From Swiss-Prot:
<protein>
    <recommendedName>
        <fullName>Protein mss51</fullName>
    </recommendedName>
</protein>
<dbReference type="GO" id="GO:0033617">
    <property type="term" value="P:mitochondrial cytochrome c oxidase assembly"/>
</dbReference>
<dbReference type="GO" id="GO:0031966">
    <property type="term" value="C:mitochondrial membrane"/>
</dbReference>
<dbReference type="InterPro" id="IPR032717">
    <property type="entry name" value="Mss51_Znf"/>
</dbReference>
<keyword id="KW-0507">mRNA processing</keyword>
<dbReference type="Pfam" id="PF20179">
    <property type="entry name" value="MSS51_C"/>
</dbReference>
<keyword id="KW-0496">Mitochondrion</keyword>
<comment type="similarity">
    <text>Belongs to the MSS51 family.</text>
</comment>
<keyword id="KW-0999">Mitochondrion inner membrane</keyword>
<keyword id="KW-0472">Membrane</keyword>
<dbReference type="GO" id="GO:0005743">
    <property type="term" value="C:mitochondrial inner membrane"/>
</dbReference>
<dbReference type="Pfam" id="PF13824">
    <property type="entry name" value="zf-Mss51"/>
</dbReference>
<dbReference type="InterPro" id="IPR046824">
    <property type="entry name" value="Mss51-like_C"/>
</dbReference>
<keyword id="KW-0508">mRNA splicing</keyword>
<comment type="function">
    <text>Has a dual role in the assembly of cytochrome oxidase subunit 1 (cox1). It has a regulative function on cox1 synthesis, acting as a translational activator specific for the cox1 mRNA, and it also binds to newly synthesized cox1 protein.</text>
</comment>
<dbReference type="GO" id="GO:0008380">
    <property type="term" value="P:RNA splicing"/>
</dbReference>
<dbReference type="GO" id="GO:0006397">
    <property type="term" value="P:mRNA processing"/>
</dbReference>
Length: 378
């Protein structure tokens, strides 16, 4: 039995957590119900959704008859209901007391296992979770820093046997050379490791303590700069008071606009990397805005790591990458299941048939490197 299951106690009744979204006590969820009605159409008739599923609480169809006919939706009801209850659970007073008991920085000789959430929680001595719902809440936060942190760490679960390419190992060796130096060497290096989070939305609103868990605490003594970049980035009115090893920077603009004016020059593959959590590269409405950014990413010659909510989305994103960048890139990590995907379910408001775990898959690329060899003429 897994570590998480050993920790979970008997769950309390959850009936009080369920509310139809349109009648939710939470204003945000009532607004979400209205938003779904604006962007989603009945999958049977294509008409506006007016009927609210009595079992999941989501507005899903134009009438009850079509709700009964939709076999796909019927199979998704348990997941949608769990999403509903999890949202309402977070509205309770102090829903996650575990956040106040998170472990501190690792000692230099401490070893962490990154094979799974189970092994990570165990070796980092996380507090005991009260329920599987608590685990879903915690991992829905930690999935973002841990998705990139687990790639960069020397104990990464990704290797040459399960998707990491020789080029990927080369890029990570450069980054790890700086990340895992002795504390005495770290303290004399003023340059931070910079992680550029592109297309940032939820990531920029995470508590800084969550980013500390997935970055600074895994790499003792290392300095980090996080740059959240994208048109949906919310710039805080007051910058958080953070420990000096971590600094957060918010840029409410497209990356290619900032790249054009040299905002982050110079780049160094030993110090800099890019993280694109579930980018909408292949989405018809957003694909064109990503194209100039993709070209600029290649010009930095730094590693680029992406996550995806599903294998179908990964395939579509790779098609766009290959069509746009053609022969100018090489893979670093072949698409694989992300060991630190969220355990909680999420749903796309514009397609309630698309229920997924955030950051379900991970892959990576960089600019194509050419090996130059001297060939003597006979």
């Amino acid at each position: 039995m897994s570590f998480l299951k050993n920790l979970f106690k008997k769950k309390s009744p959850t009936h009080e957590l369920f509310h139809p979204l349109s009648r939710s006590p939470l204003t945000a969820l009532r607004r979400r119900s209205e938003h779904i009605k604006q962007v989603y159409r009945c999958p049977i008739s294509g008409k506006s959704v007016e009927y609210e599923c009595p079992e999941s609480g989501f507005p899903t169809h134009c009438n009850r008859t079509h709700w009964e006919q939709d076999k796909i939706h019927q199979s998704l009801i348990p997941k949608l209901r769990q999403i509903n209850e999890d949202y309402h659970d977070l509205a309770r007073p102090n829903p996650l007391p575990e956040l106040l008991k998170l472990p501190g920085p690792m000692e230099e000789d401490e070893v962490v296992s990154l094979l799974s959430w189970d092994s990570f929680f165990y070796t980092r001595d996380f507090p005991k979770f009260q329920s599987s719902r608590t685990a879903r809440h915690i991992t829905s936060l930690l999935t973002y820093p841990m998705s990139i942190g687990a790639i960069l760490h020397k104990n990464s679960p990704y290797n040459l046997k399960n998707g990491l390419t020789p080029q990927g190992l080369q890029s990570l060796t450069a980054l790890r050379y700086m990340l895992h130096r002795p504390l005495s060497a770290q303290s004399t290096d003023p340059r931070p490791t910079r992680i550029f989070v592109l297309g940032a939305t939820k990531e920029c609103s995470l508590p800084p303590s969550i980013w500390l868990q997935g970055l600074n605490f895994l790499f003792p003594g290392r300095l980090f700069q996080l740059h959240f970049i994208g048109p949906e980035v919310v710039v805080p009115s007051k910058q958080p008071n953070l420990p000096s090893p971590l600094s957060l920077h918010f840029h409410q603009d497209y990356y290619h606009n900032l790249h054009r004016v040299g905002a982050f020059e110079p780049f160094d593959p030993y110090y800099d990397t890019f993280f694109l959590p579930m980018p909408l590269i292949s989405h018809p409405l957003y694909s064109s805005s990503w194209i100039p950014t993709l070209h600029d990413l290649v010009s930095t010659r730094c590693s680029v790591w992406l996550t995806s909510p599903s294998s179908q989305r990964t395939t579509k994103d790779l098609e766009v990458l290959n069509n746009v960048l053609k022969d100018s890139i090489e893979p670093l990590l072949l698409p694989t299941v992300n060991k630190f995907a969220s355990l909680g379910w999420s749903v796309d408001d514009s397609n309630l048939h698309e229920v997924y775990h955030a950051n379900q898959e991970v892959f990576g690329f960089r600019a194509l490197y050419y090996n130059v060899q001297n060939v003597s003429k006979e």
